[in-house]
Structures are given as structure tokens and as C-alpha cells.
Amino acid sequence: RMTDEALRTPTLLEAAQVSKAWPFEEARKLLKRYPDGKPDGSPVLFETGYGPSGLPHIGTFQEVLRTTLVRRAYETLSGGAPTRLVAFSDDMDGLRKVPDNIENKGLLAAYLGHPLTRIPDPFGKYESFAHHNNAMLREFLDQFGFDYEFVSASDRYNSGQFDDALRGVLRNWQAIMDIMLPTLREERRQTYSPVLPVSPKTHQVLQVPVEVVDAEAGIVRFDDHGEMVESCILAAMPSCSGRSTG
């Protein structure tokens, strides 16, 4: 990370203020909201997303690099406002297809649709396929010296850190649907839901309509292959022990 002294170098600041390079153009948009950093002094958050259904690749590198460039541009223009970069892994997503560049494809084929952290590691090294790819991501980013914090979706869901946000989604369900549905094609509208339940029968992530039963308790209802079931999407509620959604 650049030192505060380096960020305040007159020559650098002057160059940054007139630069037409896209990282500075993007940083200026953020500067309008936080000209001197966040009012409470906490770091401005930058975030990248990674889907660990495959190994990290050049696109992964590009996303982290682009975000880092905007982050550094913002730090320069703001005179050194604190920032942090989170590399977020969407490792609760269902496996959509078997990657071409991995061994033991037959093992993965049996787990199509399953959450990535609940699929065995075909390399036989980690707790799951997602854990393996998450480790490869960190190793990949570390090789290039990126300054980041790694966050796993599964860890956040299972620890209950997302419970308050999930309750907020359930409380405001219809308002969210009213915003999202007009943006989707008709086919996707028929199955869209702000949360994706996991089937108790097949253990696959489902894209089906969902009904809120109890927002505070985190209970939802959905069609699981012809059978209506109720399940909980929260981690910290007693009624959610053995929960099947995320």
C-alpha cells in the first residue's frame, strides 16, 4: 500500500487530479460520495467476486487488478483515505457444469447443482472442491502481491453473520421482487427468488419461486420436485438446526 506521504506528493496529486485514465475517472465518482473517506473513519470497502466452480484464471486476475487500480486512484485523490479490498468467494453457489481442466470429472458430475462447499475435492487435498479452489485463489493472488482480505460466503452463512441481512431480505420481499422482476426475461421471472433454497431431497441449489412464511424466524416455503416444503435460511435460530437452505 502507498504511504500517506507518497499519496500527498504534490506532483502525484497534480497528475492524478487531471488524469483521464479510467481508474481515476471511476475513483472520482466515489470521491463525490466520500471526498475525505467515510465519516466514521472506517475504510472504504472495495470488493471482487470469485466463483470457485473452477480454478482461478486470467479473468480472476483482471478483476482484482482493475479493482485495485481504482482503489489506489481513490486513495491518491482523497489524500490517503483508508480503504480495504475484499475478495469474496461465492462458494455456496451450485455447480453448473464440470470444468474441463480438472481431474476425476466423474466425481464432480455426480454433484451437479450441489453447493460448491458440499462437493468432495477431486484433487483429494481439501475439505471440498470450493475449499481447494479458494486456496488456489489465495495462492494466485499472493503471487502477485495483492493486498486483500479473503471472505467465504459459506463461512459467513454458516456462522450466522448474514442472518440479519437475510431477515432484511425476507421482511422486504415484495419490494425487492417489484424492483427485480421488471429487469428479467419472462422465463427467469417464473423462477426468480432473492434466496435460492437447497433441496432436502437432492441437496441441489434450486431456482424456484419462494414464499416467505416467517421473516423473523427465517422460514420459507418452496416446491421441491413436486412437494411443498418449509425450511429455514438462518444459521442462528434453534428452528434452523439441520437447515437446508442458504
Tell what function each PLM region has.
Residues D93, D155-G160, D214-A215:
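A short acidic, often aromatic-flanked loop/helix-cap motif at beta-alpha or helix-coil junctions
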Residues R1-I58, R72, T76-A87, E103-A109, ...:
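Non-catalytic terminal extensions that flank enzyme cores
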Residues G59-V70:
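Active/ligand-binding-proximal structured segments within catalytic/core domains
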Residues N133-V195:
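A broadly conserved sequence feature marking short terminus-proximal activation segments
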Residues M92-A109, A165-R167:
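Charged, often glycine-rich, active-site loop that binds/positions anionic groups
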Residues V86-L95, A153:
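Short, solvent-exposed turn/loop segments enriched in Gly/Ser/Thr/Pro and often Arg
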Residues A16, P52-F61, L116-S128, S154, ...:
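The substrate-binding groove and active-site-proximal loops of carbohydrate-active enzymes
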Residues K105-F140, F144:
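A glycine-rich helix N-cap at a beta->alpha junction
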